């Protein structure tokens, strides 16, 4: 018969071993060296996790998966890769690194990173009554390849500069800066995404003068802090748009007035009209060529007053460039067509007036010469009569 002391000792040993296993199991946990990983599009990322304290996980199930996905990214079970259960979008892009699996360290290497790989991942261990997982976040970044600055045609409000850049992820930050590094307020900012989730950015700036020097378009990635800059220097002539078309308008008005004055001078010079001939002056002023000149002058004056003070659309309106361009271009078209139509008619009318005045002067001279011819004819008749009488007397 066994002694009671032996049973007590055996029970104590079993309890001690059970407690050791429980304590050891409770101490095991899964961790990761870093919870945030950065990877570039087209590059690779290594998702590492380990069991601490070090413990072999060779016969455990190791799984990487993403929340919201029914299939795992990678599954290791029974010492083999379970390819048929993995998500198809990761096929031929994953590599299981298990050199330190005996120490509880494993890694999943993902090749050819794309934007769809961005997001959180979980690494879990399951086996021998132990199950635990660790979460890590993979941040995929992409830096745009090209940044372009386009300058739109100047209008009455200034010069619109546009900065375009694509191929960014995540959405970058954009801002305009001057040559001193000061931030300039943008007029409009917008973005879009393509099917691959790349961001395409667009930002505009309205410049009314050249006091800013060179203009710099800055784009930087908020995750990596990488920045790209593209600068442009605008010629001063672009900011003289208002002065140019105002000078053109003034030149047109002066041409019309010169034609008007020339027409009046030529009319008075041809007719010999004195300065007090109000009736003839009124006829000249009310003639239709002069009325056309008046119409052009009033139209040009109206646009010269209206354009600088007209109510304008908001700078954030997508149709802002269209609105400010068409009204100025319409002015030039109207003036051009009016000049091309009216100036030849005025010149032809002046030529017609000169021809009419010349004929009128010739007719006037002919009428004045008729009495002289009559007197000469009478004189010659009397002379012949006197000559005939004297000849008869002599005979």
UniProtKB/Swiss-Prot annotation:
Glycosylated position list: 92, 139
Organism field: Mus musculus (Mouse)
Places the protein is found: Membrane
Region annotation Disordered: where it falls in the sequence: 371-395
Family, per entry: Belongs to the SKINT family.
Signal peptide range: 1-25
Lipid bilayer topology: Multi-pass membrane protein
PROSITE patterns, per the entry: IG_LIKE
Family annotation (Pfam families): C2-set_3, V-set
Misc note: Encoded by one of the 11 copies of Skint genes clustered in the D1 region of the chromosome 4.
Disulfide pattern: 49-123, 163-217
Extracellular side: 26-248, 309-329
Chain segments annotated as transmembrane: 249-269, 288-308, 330-350
PANTHER family listed in its UniProt record: BUTYROPHILIN (PTHR24100), SELECTION AND UPKEEP OF INTRAEPITHELIAL T-CELLS PROTEIN 7-RELATED (PTHR24100:SF51)
Keyword field: Disulfide bond, Glycoprotein, Immunoglobulin domain, Membrane, Repeat, Signal, Transmembrane, Transmembrane helix
Assigned GO CC terms: membrane
Role, per record: May act by engaging a cell surface molecule on immature T-cells in the embryonic thymus.
Domain of life: Eukaryota
Annotated Ig-like C1-type domain residues: 142-233
Tissue: Expressed in skin, thymus, testis and, to a lower extent, bladder.
Protein name: Selection and upkeep of intraepithelial T-cells protein 7
Principal cellular location given in the protein's record: membrane
Record has Disulfide bond as a keyword: yes
Spans within the Cytoplasmic topological domain: 270-287, 351-395
Gene3D superfamilies per UniProt: Immunoglobulins
Residues in Ig-like V-type domain copies: 26-141
């Amino acid at each position: 018969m066994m002694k009671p002391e032996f049973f007590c000792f055996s029970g104590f040993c079993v309890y001690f071993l059970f407690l050791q296993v429980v304590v050891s199991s409770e101490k095991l946990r899964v961790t990761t060296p870093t919870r945030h990983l950065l990877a570039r599009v087209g590059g690779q990322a290594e998702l590492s996790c380990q069991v601490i304290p070090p413990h072999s996980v060779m016969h455990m199930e190791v799984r990487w998966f993403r929340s919201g996905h029914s299939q795992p990214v990678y599954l290791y079970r029974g010492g083999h890769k379970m390819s048929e259960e993995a998500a198809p979008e990761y096929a031929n892009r994953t590599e299981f690194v298990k050199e330190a699996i005996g120490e509880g360290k494993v890694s999943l290497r993902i090749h050819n990173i794309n934007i769809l790989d961005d997001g959180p991942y979980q690494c879990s261990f399951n086996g021998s009554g132990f199950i635990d997982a660790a979460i890590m976040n993979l941040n995929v970044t992409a830096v745009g390849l090209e940044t372009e600055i386009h300058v739109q045609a100047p209008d009455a409000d200034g010069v619109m500069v546009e900065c375009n850049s694509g191929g960014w992820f995540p959405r970058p930050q954009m801002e305009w800066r001057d040559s001193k590094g000061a931030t300039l307020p943008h007029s409009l900012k917008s973005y879009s995404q393509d099917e691959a989730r790349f961001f395409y950015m667009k930002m505009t700036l309205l410049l009314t003068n050249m006091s800013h020097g060179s203009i710099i378009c800055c784009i930087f990635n908020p995750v990596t802090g990488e920045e790209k800059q593209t600068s442009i220097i605008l010629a001063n002539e672009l900011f003289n748009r208002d002065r140019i078309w105002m000078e053109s308008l003034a030149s047109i008005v002066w041409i019309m007035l010169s034609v008007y004055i020339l027409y009046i001078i030529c009319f008075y010079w041809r007719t010999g009209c004195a300065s007090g001939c109000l009736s003839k002056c009124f006829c000249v002023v009310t003639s239709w060529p002069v009325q056309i000149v008046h119409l052009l002058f009033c139209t040009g004056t109206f646009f010269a007053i209206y354009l600088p003070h007209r109510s304008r659309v908001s700078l954030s309106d997508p149709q802002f460039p269209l609105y400010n361009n068409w009204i100025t271009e319409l002015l030039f078209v109207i003036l051009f067509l009016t000049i091309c139509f009216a100036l030849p008619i005025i010149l032809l009318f002046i030529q017609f007036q000169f021809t009419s005045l010349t004929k009128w002067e010739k007719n006037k001279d002919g009428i004045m010469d008729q009495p002289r011819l009559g007197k000469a004819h009478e004189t010659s008749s009397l002379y012949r009569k006197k000559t005939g009488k004297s000849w008869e007397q002599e005979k």
